[in-house]
Amino acid sequence: MKNVLKYLLLALIAVSQLFACGGSDDEKAPADNFDVQFTVPGSVDVTEGGECTFAVSGGGRKSPLTTDTFILESDAGISYVCPIVNTTSDSFTVRLADGCETGYYKVFVKRDARKKSFGRIYINIVEDIDFKPDAGTTVYGIVSSAGVGVENVVVSDGAEVTVTNEKGIYQLKSAKKWGYVFISVPSGYEVPSVGVLPQFHRALKNSADVVERADFKLEKVDGQDSYKIFMLGDMHLANRTGDLGQFAQFTSDLTDYMTRHKGEKMYALTLGDMTWDLYWYSNSYYFPQYLNTVNSQIKNLQIFHTMGNHDNDFQTRSDYDAAVKYVDQICPTYYSFNIGKVHYVVMDDIDCSSYDGSTSRNYVKSLSAEQLDWLAKDLSHVDKTTPVVVAMHAQVFYPTTSGFKIDHDPVNTQRLFDILDGYTVRFVTGHTHKLFNVTPDAPIVDGHNFREYNSGSVCASWWWSGNLTPGIHIGTDGTPGGYGIWDVTGTDFQCLYKSTGWPEEYQFQIGRAHV
């Protein structure tokens, strides 16, 4: 009897181990063990509901089966099932599912219960424009309004500059250094916005040897013969010294002003230092938080942006790397646009080439040769009779005891002046947290028809005065924190500085001394 029980016990143990081993094998079996491998490009251009083909890669690998399921999963977690319509040993083709929009997607192939991941792709939904790019072209696209191509729109990658043809199509032999392409928004049009940011540029997704397409949409608008543009000097938002609460007072003031002038065209242009690099890491406040703050408080206003020294990443070691976060999340560091009869140019005059990754932030006030080369090409499409507004963060001139001096790299500044010679130019700058103007009759201007408006700051004294003495919000020269308001009618400019919390008429105050 004991022997029988012994054998039964051994048999049960053996059977249990057999089932345990079988279950373990199933649990450890990879969910993606079917033999499919293909190349996922950085992006694909495809018409709505159109087809796209993928190359099969890997020695001995195979295409998916037509009975497999090809899935695109959006960043929002929505899955789109795209039918596999054809397969060969070298490639396979899928038809884009209805509802797929331009954007990033995770790529999966599912076979039975097994699901295999293949990475991430950018799906670019485009119109069929029946156009084959020239040899050497790496970026092309169409600029259109209401489904019709717009001719003579200036397009650039920051180095090469071209214009759209009669069908609104452009092409560039771009090295894709900056990874974007932008248009100079033409007069009489606007681009769509994401929050306050006008969408005049497109990020490129592929390497320089891959041809890709980037399209732009324009909306025709009226009312640009007379409009207002707000000049927003240094903000220095960093979530410190009560800055966010004080900033809300500024946005409330701006909103009230816009409400009183409802029906008029309005735009805005920052003058740099929207953020404060020292607090990007310690306070976790930089461009995403800045945009959240601004977008929650300012509505129905396109804000073009200028880069300041504090908008560069100090934990880098080159001018290019210092600007990467700004370019990725705000816009190009230099570009142009048109409103009405005025051509606006935004430039980056903070050179961070000597950054060493520390808080020393050894920048110089200078315009790169690359920017100046681009500017000359950009202005070749602008008539000399067109007024030009050049926005930069750091001042071109600076007051001295006897007048003004050039406060920039002298060599590149002289080249800037040479390029702008013959134009009526208004420089608008920030950086100093002060107010001063330079007019064409100043000797330092040397006969050019140049003006400079150093346009104060939103934050006044880096928000310190309002934090220490609530209700007193002044800069180092006594100017209250505020913003510029330019009324532009045709080619005529009326420029006003508005102090936050005060009416436009409040322009000067003298304190009486107590003796």
Task: List where the protein language model places each region.
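Hydrophobic beta-strand segments
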Residues: 13, 70, 153-157, 181
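Bacterial Sec-dependent N-terminal signal peptides
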Residues: 15-44, 114-135
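Immunoglobulin-like IPT/TIG beta-sandwich domains and homologous Ig-like subdomains
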Residues: 40, 46-116, 158-160
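N-terminal active-site segment of His-dependent metallophosphoesterases
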Residues: 130-138, 145, 188-281
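Short, acidic Ser/Thr/Gly-rich low-complexity loop/linker segments typical of extracellular
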Residues: 153-174
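Extended active-site neighborhood of metal-dependent phosphoesterases/phosphodiesterases
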Residues: 186-205, 210-212, 280-382, 407, ...
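Short acidic, glycine-rich surface-loop motifs adjacent to enzyme active sites
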Residues: 379-404
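Conserved small/polar residues in nucleotide/adenosyl-binding loops
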Residues: 513-515
